[in-house]
């Protein structure tokens, strides 16, 4: 029996695909739009660690779908590139003393080697790298379009600054912890600092970013996260005059029906009125409070915790309708960047305001009650009801009627107006780091910004050995004086660089025309391919990359550079591949290399105490990161591809278990060993012909729906049936090779050649069609149980034997998920009825 030499086979076909450019695609105008597909992965950041087994999950999913569609006659664009600018490369360079350009190139080469070893059907002629001058030239050009459209501006503003990273971070890059705000990357301390920043007016597109979500085939959870991040509120902006000042405080509210219950106002610490209106004898308290609160993140300040703090300014405002004096407070739970930076306190009808009023002994005035009468309030009344304690024309009415009357009164008397606000803030676009796109702006002596012309692009990132952060908040570029000061002029260059999100905002467009030196992409090529039909990547990018790229795309659409309103038609978030970790009794996770196994139990080497096996995210500190290189060497790329898809539904998180790949490897060996049988051109028995059409149907339907795990399960069942026959029937084997090929392309190509066909299979075959009339309906419903409780029901061939039933049951995803950390006592099989797995 000839051995399944997967290393030799995979190397052979990877070289064949490369040499013959099997997956190269060009724009053929004769192919109709409905037969074109743009399938895309979120491109990787080339870290020094290389790929781990979690990376190929999404790539394998798009690869299977792309190959399946190619075999179904579709013209498929499936490109790859590298998101190679940004903080991680620079931090790695600082740690190792290797220039980021050199280390990035080395890491890309490592990633490419690993990606190619997995046999993905990428068109490598379209490869892009965001740090390449010919790429970031167009990133800079798009920034200039934003600037010319009035969507990019520079301003002094309070921003999050990370001393450790040496740069400003956007709100989206800050996470709140019990120990204060931290940087998302590196988990470092951050502080507030006033710096001149470039900002993009994403808020101008808030309404469209919100409304156009309805047109997208995206997970509802992702759409909801974007809706919440954009945070649209419809209400009224009310003007409050300040006693003794000509200034007004503008307050936005969605509850104008509670206006007569206002007993205080709160303004944000950043509000410029704070310094002006705070009375002298209150100033020290106010300044102390602001200093105390300034390190809290926006998320912490606006969290749902009811215990909010504040301090009185000593000043008062006038109620716009009743003219009653209202005390003005400063409170950090109000953000200067959201709405008008002020809120009205209505403690009788808002739980947060109620707690605030109780804490500071402020008046609580109910103006709505269920009965229309005064009632003792033990907590805020937030429901609909009848108005009370209000001026006559507003009293004894449903609160919905009061709302309408108040809006009309405020509008008529020019004390307020209906308006819409958003939580979304403009995007802080500057970074005080070296490894990023230089911002193509000059400044004259007066500080006026002057955009570079197109023919001055790219503004190249200057070479320097001194790329470390300055520590002062200035960019490392500011130290390169002969670059900052433009020769023979009085102009100076902007020294901040763009954030790492800049290059990823539009990369999907550059794939369409990566070698174009005259424009970012030819318009005809954009019309040919856009939008992206299927985009697969992690949900962690919901309010960063996915929101930013939608914004840039809409700007390009408005300028006539792209033909679609949205870049990504359908989005799928793959689940996280986790790994086994080990937890001590006190809940602490310990590194995997600190654990030993004895008699199916796990112990800490240091103290010999038993630990519990748990599932956790892969991390270097836990030493549970699994590199695919070793897996490929031991089992092959086709094995890892099929195993990752077989672990469970694509969108579910699931734990990696290297033992699980052995079953997949056996499956591929079983297919390979069919070569040992006579390859017969005889007509196959009707039973196996029926099974063939059944598996073609199942794999077709499941692959179309991205249900790869169940498609693989069907192929495994079929191969068990096919292996029972003495002959290997060509009319059976050939179509099976084709349906296997998206999943195990290397093995499929080898078998395609073995049966005498011309490679590549992906150029010289078509996806087989199933014939319902040939499918014999001799199946039985088998119940799968654990300890007598039904977990799943499946249809199987009546002739499936006991051992196969056991194997199928054990590989069932609903059964597998219930067996984690359990001991199997016995497996009871009743043929054509049930499989019951007894565990303890």
Swiss-Prot record:
InterPro entries, per database record: aa-tRNA-synth_I_CS, Leu-tRNA-ligase, Leu_tRNA-synth_edit, M/V/L/I-tRNA-synth_anticd-bd, Methionyl/Leucyl_tRNA_Synth, Rossmann-like_a/b/a_fold, tRNAsynth_Ia_anticodon-bd, Val/Leu/Ile-tRNA-synth_edit
Gene Ontology molecular-function annotations: aminoacyl-tRNA deacylase activity; ATP binding; leucine-tRNA ligase activity
Keywords recorded for this protein, A-Z: Aminoacyl-tRNA synthetase, ATP-binding, Cytoplasm, Ligase, Nucleotide-binding, Protein biosynthesis
EC number: 6.1.1.4
Residues spanned by motif 'KMSKS' region: 617-621
GO cellular component, one term: cytosol
Catalytic activity reported: tRNA(Leu) + L-leucine + ATP = L-leucyl-tRNA(Leu) + AMP + diphosphate
Enzyme class, broadest EC rank: ligase
GO biological process entries: leucyl-tRNA aminoacylation
Ranges spanned by the short sequence motif 'HIGH' region, renumbered to the chain: 44-55
Cellular location(s): Cytoplasm
Recorded superkingdom: Bacteria
Keyword Membrane: no
Residue sites binding ATP per the record: 620
Gene3D superfamilies: HUPs, Isoleucyl-tRNA Synthetase, Domain 1
Disulfide bond residue pairs: none
Similarity-based family: Belongs to the class-I aminoacyl-tRNA synthetase family.
PANTHER family found in the cross-reference section: LEUCINE--TRNA LIGASE, MITOCHONDRIAL, LEUCYL-TRNA SYNTHETASE
Protein name: Leucine--tRNA ligase
């Amino acid at each position: 029996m000839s051995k399944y030499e997967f290393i030799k086979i995979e190397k052979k076909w990877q070289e064949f695909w490369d040499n013959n450019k099997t997956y190269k695609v060009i724009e053929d105008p004769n192919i109709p739009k409905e037969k074109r597909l743009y399938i895309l992965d979120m491109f990787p950041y080339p870290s020094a660690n290389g790929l781990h087994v979690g990376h190929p999950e999404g790539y394998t999913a798009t690869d299977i779908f792309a190959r399946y569609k190619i075999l179904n006659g579709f013209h498929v664009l499936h490109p790859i590139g590298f998101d190679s600018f940004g903080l991680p490369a620079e931090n790695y360079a600082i740690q190792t003393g290797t220039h980021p350009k050199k280390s990035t190139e080395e890491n890309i080469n490592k990633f490419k080697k690993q990606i190619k070893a997995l046999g993905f059907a990428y068109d490598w002629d379209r490869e892009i790298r965001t740090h390449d001058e010919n790429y970031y030239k167009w990133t800079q050009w798009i920034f200039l379009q934003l600037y010319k459209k009035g969507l990019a501006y520079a301003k002094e503003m309070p921003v999050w600054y990370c001393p450790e990273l040496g740069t400003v971070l956007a709100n989206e890059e800050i996470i709140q912890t019990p120990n204060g705000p931290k940087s998302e990357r590196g988990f470092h301390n951050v502080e507030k600092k006033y710096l001149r920043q470039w900002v993009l007016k994403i808020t101008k597109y808030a309404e469209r970013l919100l409304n156009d979500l309805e047109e997208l085939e995206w997970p509802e959870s992702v759409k909801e996260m974007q809706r919440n991040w954009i945070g649209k509120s419809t209400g009224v902006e009310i003007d409050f005059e300040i006693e003794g000042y000509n200034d007004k405080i503008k307050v936005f509210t969605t509850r104008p029906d509670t206006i007569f219950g206002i007993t205080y106002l709160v303004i944000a610490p950043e509000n410029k009125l704070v310094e002006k209106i705070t009375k002298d004898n209150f100033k020290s308290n106010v300044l102390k409070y602001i200093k105390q609160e300034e390190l809290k993140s926006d998320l912490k300040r606006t969290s749902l915790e009811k215990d909010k703090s504040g301090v009185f300014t000593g000043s008062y405002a006038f109620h716009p309708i009743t003219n009653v004096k209202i005390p003005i407070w400063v409170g950090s739970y109000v953000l200067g960047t959201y709405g008008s930076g002020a809120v009205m306190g209505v403690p009788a009808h808002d739980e947060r305001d109620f707690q605030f009023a109780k804490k500071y002994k402020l008046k609580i005035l109910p103006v709505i009650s269920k009965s229309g009468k005064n009632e003792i309030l033990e907590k805020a009344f937030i429901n609909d009801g009848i108005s009370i304690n209000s001026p006559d024309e507003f009293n004894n009415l449903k609160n919905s009627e009061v709302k309408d009357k108040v809006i009309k009164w405020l509008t008529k008397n020019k004390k307020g107006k209906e308006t819409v606000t958003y939580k979304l803030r403009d995007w802080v676009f500057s970074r005080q780091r070296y490894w990023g796109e230089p911002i193509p702006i000059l400044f004259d002596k007066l500080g006026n910004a002057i955009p570079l012309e197109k023919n001055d692009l790219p503004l190249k990132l200057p070479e320097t050995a001194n790329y470390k952060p300055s520590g002062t908040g200035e960019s490392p570029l500011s130290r390169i004086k002969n670059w900052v000061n433009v020769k023979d002029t009085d102009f100076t260059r902007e020294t901040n660089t763009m954030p790492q999100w800049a290059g990823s905002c539009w990369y999907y467009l550059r794939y369409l025309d990566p070698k174009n030196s005259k424009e970012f992409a030819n318009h005809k090529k954009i019309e040919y391919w856009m939008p992206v039909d299927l985009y697969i990547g992690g949900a962690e990018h919901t309010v960063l990359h996915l929101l930013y790229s939608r914004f840039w795309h809409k700007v390009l659409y408005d300028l006539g550079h792209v033909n679609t309103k949205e870049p990504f038609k359908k989005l799928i978030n793959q689940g996280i591949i986790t790994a086994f970790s080990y937890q001590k009794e006190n809940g602490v996770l310990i590194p995997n290399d600190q654990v030993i196994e004895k008699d199916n139990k796990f112990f800490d080497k240091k103290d010999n105490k038993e630990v519990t096996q748990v599932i956790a995210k892969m991390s270097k500190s836990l030493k549970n990161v699994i590199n695919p290189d070793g897996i490929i060497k031991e089992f092959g790329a086709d094995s890892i591809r099929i195993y990752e898809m077989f672990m469970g539904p694509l969108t579910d998180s699931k734990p990696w278990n290297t033992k699980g790949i052995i079953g997949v490897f056996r499956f591929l060996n079983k297919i390979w060993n069919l070569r040992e049988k006579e390859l017969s051109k005889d007509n196959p028995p009707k039973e196996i012909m029926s099974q063939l059409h059944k598996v073609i149907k199942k794999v077709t339907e499941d692959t179309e729906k991205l249900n790869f795990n169940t498609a693989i399960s069907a192929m495994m069942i079929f191969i068990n049936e096919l292996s029972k026959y003495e002959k290997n029937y060509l009319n059976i084997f050939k179509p099976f090779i084709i349906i296997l090929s998206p999943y195990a392309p290397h093995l499929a190509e080898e078998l395609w050649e073995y049966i005498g066909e011309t490679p590549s299979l992906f150029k010289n075959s078509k996806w087989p069609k199933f014939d319902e009339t040939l499918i014999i309906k001799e199946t039985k419903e088998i119940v799968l149980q654990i300890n007598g409780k039904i977990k799943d029901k499946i249809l199987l061939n009546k002739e499936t034997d006991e051992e196969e039933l056991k194997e199928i049951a054990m590989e069932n995803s609903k059964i597998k998920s219930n067996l984690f950390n359990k001991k199997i006592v016995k497996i009871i099989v009743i043929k054509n009825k049930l499989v019951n797995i007894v565990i303890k």
